[in-house]
From Swiss-Prot:
Gene that this sequence comes from: PNSL3
Subunit and interaction comment: Part of the chloroplast NDH complex, composed of a mixture of chloroplast and nucleus encoded subunits. Component of the NDH lumenal subcomplex, at least composed of PnsL1, PnsL2, PnsL3, PnsL4 and PnsL5.
Family: Belongs to the PsbQ family.
Keyword Thylakoid recorded: yes
InterPro entries registered for this protein in UniProt: PsbQ-like_dom_sf, PSII_PsbQ, PSII_PsbQ_pln
Domain of life, source organism: Eukaryota
GO molecular function, one term: calcium ion binding
Lineage, highest ranks first: Eukaryota, Viridiplantae, Streptophyta, Embryophyta, Tracheophyta
Annotated transit peptide: 1-35, 36-77
Function: NDH shuttles electrons from NAD(P)H:plastoquinone, via FMN and iron-sulfur (Fe-S) centers, to quinones in the photosynthetic chain and possibly in a chloroplast respiratory chain. The immediate electron acceptor for the enzyme in this species is believed to be plastoquinone. Couples the redox reaction to proton translocation, and thus conserves the redox energy in a proton gradient. Required for both formation and activity of the chloroplast NAD(P)H dehydrogenase (NDH) complex.
Subcellular location: Plastid, Chloroplast thylakoid membrane
Biological source species: Arabidopsis thaliana (Mouse-ear cress)
Pfam families: PsbQ (PF05757)
Name of the protein in question: Photosynthetic NDH subunit of lumenal location 3, chloroplastic
GO cellular component: chloroplast; chloroplast thylakoid; chloroplast thylakoid membrane; cytosol; extrinsic component of membrane; nitrite reductase complex [NAD(P)H]; photosystem II oxygen evolving complex
Length: 220
């Protein structure tokens, strides 16, 4: 039978490792800790000072930027809203004579006042977007067609009203006629998409397409 080594007896026969005095070990550790503390204490204080300086500078800058006068200027720039979205007034005869409004107008849309040139650009861009909507028309997408039409036509409606007001006297009536023809067609197109009549939607869109091209030519 094989003999197994007694681990306890083997451990007892090994020479014991010498132990350092406790005082020397403690002194070495504490000395090292003190040196490490001295090395990092100064950078921490410098870092804190820098942060305080930076924070103070930022607070001064924000005080100057967000002062009462500057807030007042921001409120008057046409982009600052501190209440419900305003409904722009209509100054020209571009509403439906029977309803006094337009069925496609979407509520809750903020139409920023970006000046006459900005409105002309926005009219041209929205007309271009509606021309690109032709690829969206399909049997399963008429709901999206209606939503997209309402969003774009709302901007067109309010922008046209302001452009008519800013136009020369000889241009007011031609712009009004173009706007009414376009918006009458928008209402027909919206109704066809709402009733999910694909054939009627496609037919109305063909007429709308020519009017949109005329709008882009007029705003070029």
């Amino acid at each position: 039978m094989a003999h197994f080594i007694d681990l306890n007896s083997l451990t007892n026969t090994l020479p014991s490792l010498p132990k350092l005095p406790e005082s020397r070990k403690t002194g070495k550790s504490s000395g090292f800790a003190c040196r490490r503390t001295e090395e990092f204490q100064e950078p921490d204080s410098v870092q804190i000072t820098r942060r305080m300086t930076l924070g103070f500078a930022v607070s001064i800058g924000l005080t100057g930027i967000l002062g009462e006068n500057n807030v007042s200027l921001a409120q008057d720039n046409g982009f600052w809203i501190d209440g419900p979205l305003p409904i722009p007034p209509i100054y020209n005869n571009i509403v439906n004579e029977k309803t006094g409004t337009r069925t496609f107008i979407k509520k809750g849309v903020y139409v920023a006042d970006i000046g006459t040139k900005g409105r002309m650009y926005r009219v041209k861009k929205n007309a271009f977007d509606l021309l690109a909507m032709e690829d969206l028309i399909g049997p399963d997408t008429l709901n999206y067609v209606k939503k997209y039409l309402r969003l774009k036509s709302t901007f067109l409606f309010y922008d046209f009203d302001n452009l008519i007001s800013a136009a020369a006297s000889e241009d007011k009536q031609p712009l009004t006629d173009l706007a009414n023809r376009l918006f009458d067609n928008f209402e027909k197109l919206e109704d066809a998409a709402k009733t999910k009549n694909l054939a009627e939607t496609e037919s109305c869109y063909k007429d709308t397409k020519f009017l949109l091209q005329e709008v882009m030519t007029r705003m070029a």
